[in-house]
């Protein structure tokens, strides 16, 4: 049975994990790191770079490097590169494809199934977009799981039978969630969740960037926001400074040649940022985490003292101010240090993949919907059918009627949110139920059913009880991708995968050819410069020279077939040269004469075979 992986598709970094012998293992990427930057870059030569290679070239390729695309999931955001439009799903799919490739290389087998995590506070459109990204990457998404739930699953499975209440405080690169879960006897049940989809480590970075821009403007009078390359360098320096301030009281930010003045003289940025100043300029961001925490405690109907364990998730929770705030909010409770905040979500996703594949037994995951769902009714009111923090999957029905006499149809507008007025919430989608027989208002019976699946994706049905006529919508309005568009993107991604494979193959062929040219050229040079002259005729060496010249010409072009052909010819000429040298050496030994020479010649029968075999093997290797 094919194995399934667990993927934490993060705003700044992503992680993939898999079960090995029942235990979750985080898979290192092809660069050797356990986390992969969620960055995609389109190089000017047509190559698509993902992860660390994309991050490495960001400064010199600002306009064609995309990061933090998770913040655009479920919106109509897109970016145009070389005349082609890319959606957030397609960019995310590139990251997923890299994680998939790295996991396949680690396991030595193809992977098609995956569990992908999302922030608990992601709405329906964002979840749908994440699932579409998985499909474009060639993955069968078994389940979309909330990140805090996955973290609790990873943390809580080995904690015995005793029922425990766990608070998961998840502050990632672009999103924030806080969730309260109960774990016991193999059941992980989410009691309540809240959060902010537009709050994360990126915002802390931005504050440092703004601080640096203001400082530089104050000393030089130059506004760096107008220089894209300078801003990219500032962002990278800000992220580094933020990380350093988690373990140091101050950090130096030194960027030479950040820009030039009016006289084209180079200018340098050199600032000292203290932890106290950093906390001062980001205090309001930290305060935004307080209300979701209070909401979760209230929604779950418990007191802070009932919390048994606090689990921190996301790299941003390493900031001392965040840890201190969590301690303050939980009445001094020390957060658990036994989990890696960067990896715990992917580990939980791998465990859930194991549950769905039957590899992990006796575990039940009960997740919740983060926001209320309902429809707009007379007066623009939001009538909720499913309240927030309802355990999913779930199904709820309610009967409505018409607002006007002889109304032939009803418009069903589906919203997600907590506001009393429908328009103030997130419109997920709308559809029409037609063919209602003429009748006074209030007479027709229209049954509206909301069905949320285990991925948190919503299906809505409206049915006229009188005629039995019904209409259904699967909410995907937020992502706006039709099945045809998704199929096209899948094909496009597959085509790019083939392009990437060809490019890697071409690079390998070029490397082999360049290596062979270098080694053969050196060998010929050594022969010509040997003491007593070359052991082989100049004619033989000239043939090798010609083959080297042909190979160099081929390497100067882009025709890989020509390079392969030239490399093959050079290999043959090299082999002929090796054979000629061997024969010349044998002839010299024979001419040496005398008993020693004869003995040497006479005792070399089996040795000849061995030496000959070694020469042939060496030549084959050089091909």
Curated annotation (Swiss-Prot):
Domain of life from the UniProt record: Bacteria
Residue segments, region Disordered: 587-623
PROSITE patterns (alphabetical): HSP70_1, HSP70_2, HSP70_3
Ranges annotated as spanning the membrane: none
A Pfam family reported for this protein in Swiss-Prot or TrEMBL: HSP70
Compositional bias (Gly residues): 594-605
HAMAP family, A to Z: DnaK
Protein name: Chaperone protein DnaK
């Amino acid at each position: 049975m094919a194995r399934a992986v667990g993927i934490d598709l993060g705003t700044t970094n992503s992680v993939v994990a898999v079960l090995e012998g029942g235990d979750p293992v985080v898979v290192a990427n092809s660069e050797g790191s356990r986390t992969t930057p969620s960055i995609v870059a389109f190089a000017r030569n047509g190559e698509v770079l993902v992860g660390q290679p994309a991050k490495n070239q960001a400064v010199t390729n600002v306009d064609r490097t995309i990061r933090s695309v998770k913040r655009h999931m479920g919106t109509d955001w897109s970016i145009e590169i070389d005349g082609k439009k890319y959606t957030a799903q397609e960019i995310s799919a590139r990251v997923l494809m890299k994680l998939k490739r790295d996991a396949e290389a680690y396991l030595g087998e193809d992977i098609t199934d995956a569990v992908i995590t999302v922030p608990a506070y992601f709405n329906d459109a964002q979840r749908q977009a994440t699932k579409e990204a998985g499909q474009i990457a060639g993955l069968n998404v078994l389940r979309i799981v909330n990140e805090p739930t996955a973290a609790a699953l990873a943390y809580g499975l080995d904690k015995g039978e005793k029922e425990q209440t766990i608070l998961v405080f998840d502050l990632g690169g672009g999103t924030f969630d806080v969730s309260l879960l109960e774990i016991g006897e193999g059941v992980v049940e989410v009691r309540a969740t809240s959060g902010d989809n537009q709050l994360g480590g990126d915002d802390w970075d931005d504050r440092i960037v703004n601080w640096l821009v203001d400082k530089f403007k104050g000393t030089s009078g130059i506004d760096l926001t107008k220089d894209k390359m300078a801003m990219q360098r500032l962002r990278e320096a800000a992220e580094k400074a933020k990380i350093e301030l988690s373990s140091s009281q101050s950090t130096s930010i030194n960027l030479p040649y950040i820009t030039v003045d009016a006289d084209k003289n180079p200018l340098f940025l050199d600032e000292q940022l203290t932890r106290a100043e950093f906390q001062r300029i980001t205090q309001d961001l930290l305060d935004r985490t307080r209300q979701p925490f209070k909401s979760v405690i209230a929604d779950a109907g418990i007191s802070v003292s009932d919390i048994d364990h606090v689990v921190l998730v996301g790299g941003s929770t390493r900031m001392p101010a965040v840890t201190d705030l969590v301690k303050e909010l939980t009445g001094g409770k020390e957060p658990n240090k036994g989990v890696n905040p960067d990896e715990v979500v992917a580990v939980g996703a791998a465990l859930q993949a194991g549950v769905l594949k039957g590899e992990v037994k006796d575990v039940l995951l009960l997740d919740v919907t983060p926001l209320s769902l309902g429809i707009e009714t007379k007066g623009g009111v939001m009538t909720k059918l499913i309240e927030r923090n309802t355990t999913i999957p779930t199904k709820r029905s309610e009967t409505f009627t018409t607002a006007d006499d002889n109304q032939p149809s009803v418009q069903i507008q589906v919203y997600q949110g907590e506001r009393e007025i429908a328009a103030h919430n997130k419109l997920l989608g709308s559809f029409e139920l037609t063919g209602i027989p003429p009748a006074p208002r209030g007479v027709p019976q229209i049954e509206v059913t909301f069905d949320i699946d285990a991925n948190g994706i919503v299906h809505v049905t409206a049915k006229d009880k009188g005629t039995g006529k019904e209409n259904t919508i699967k909410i995907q309005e937020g992502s706006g991708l039709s099945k045809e568009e998704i199929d096209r993107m899948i094909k496009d991604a597959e085509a790019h995968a083939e392009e990437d494979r060809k490019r890697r193959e071409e690079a390998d062929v070029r490397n082999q050819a360049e290596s062979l040219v270098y080694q053969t050229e050196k060998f010929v040079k050594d022969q010509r410069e040997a003491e007593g002259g070359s052991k082989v005729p100049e004619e033989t060496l000239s043939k090798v020279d010609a083959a080297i010249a042909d190979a160099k010409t081929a390497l100067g072009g882009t025709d890989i077939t020509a390079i392969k052909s030239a490399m093959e010819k050079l290999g043959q000429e090299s082999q002929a040269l090796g054979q000629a040298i061997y024969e010349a050496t044998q002839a010299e030994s024979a001419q040496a004469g005398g008993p020693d020479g004869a003995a040497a010649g006479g005792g070399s029968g089996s040795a000849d075979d061995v030496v000959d075999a070694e020469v042939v093997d060496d030549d084959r290797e050089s091909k």
